Amino acid sequence: MFRPTGGCSLAILGVFIFHIGEVQSQCWESSRCADLSSEDGILECIKACKMDLSAESPVFPGNGHLQPLSESIRKYVMTHFRWNKFGRRNNTGNDGSSGGYKREDISNYPVLNLFPSSDNQNAQGDNMEEEPMDRQENKRAYSMEHFRWGKPVGRKRRPIKVYPNGVEEESAESFPMELRRELSLELDYPEIDLDEDIEDNEVERALTKKNGNYRMHHFRWGSPPKDKRYGGFMTPERSQTPLMTLFKNAIIKNTHKKGL
């Protein structure tokens, strides 16, 4: 006869087997369930059956190479993927403490609550699984530096230089001395008196202060001479002779015609 503790453990094992059903047929065939005469042997058999039930895929009878992988091997293989966890679709919580629906159904058994759960193992597995994700993010950041949008590297545009006198210094240096003299002689500047120029400058300065517009007078197109506006075809040609000489010439021509 067994001791009372042994009878209690046998009753627990019977209830456990009743809930499991046909899936536990291979659990009886294991070497751990061979010795059921002592309480330690019964506990070893129950732990072995619990480990078999922790697998998320069903146990198929047949050869050993067709059976699913164990939990430790599955975790090792799945850490190499991006999703990093097996059966994450079935998770209901963000903290990772709650597993899929199959594991939740197994954990609801009152018999399994008597033994220590594998929460500590899952927490250690989560910590080990977070490290490959950090490495993958670091590798991705390193690889994106080689692209244009990862870290833009390019030439900076040169700023446009604005000279106060309106003439670039390089343009004057590009021409030799003789060509610069010829250009200065060929340019037609408007003939303006100094007094009028000073008065005009004062008026224009007052206007620029009021209106805020800047008028360029140092270019030819700033204030061209009147005789050259519109190409010269809008202004009448002026004769160099005065009016009195014109009248005299007209009278002399008329007298010559009458005399003839």
From Swiss-Prot:
Q: Which family would the database say this protein is a member of?
A: Belongs to the POMC family.
Q: Which residues form the propeptide?
A: 104-138
Q: This chain belongs to which protein, by name? A: Pro-opiomelanocortin B
Q: Where are glycans found on this sequence?
A: 90
Q: Which GO terms describe its cellular component?
A: extracellular space; secretory granule
- Which residues get modified to Valine amide? 153
Species source reads Xenopus laevis (African clawed frog)
Against InterPro entries, the record matches this protein to: Mcrtin_ACTH_cent (IPR013531), Melanocortin_N (IPR013593), Opioid_neuropept (IPR013532), PMOC (IPR001941), POMC-derived_peptides (IPR050878)
Query: Where do the record's region annotations for Disordered lie?
Result: 116-136
Q: Which gene encodes it?
A: pomc-b
Q: Does the keyword Signal apply?
A: yes
Sites where Phenylalanine amide occurs are at 86
The residues forming a coiled coil are none
Q: List modified residues, type Pyrrolidone carboxylic acid.
A: 26
The organism's lineage?
Answer: Eukaryota, Metazoa, Chordata, Craniata, Vertebrata
Task: Kindly list the GO molecular function terms attached to this UniProt entry.
Answer: G protein-coupled receptor binding; hormone activity
Q: Does the keyword Transport apply?
A: no
Q: Where in the cell is it found?
A: Secreted
Keyword annotations of the record: Amidation, Cleavage on pair of basic residues, Endorphin, Glycoprotein, Hormone, Pyrrolidone carboxylic acid, Secreted, Signal
Task: Tell me how the protein is altered or processed after translation.
Answer: Specific enzymatic cleavages at paired basic residues yield the different active peptides.
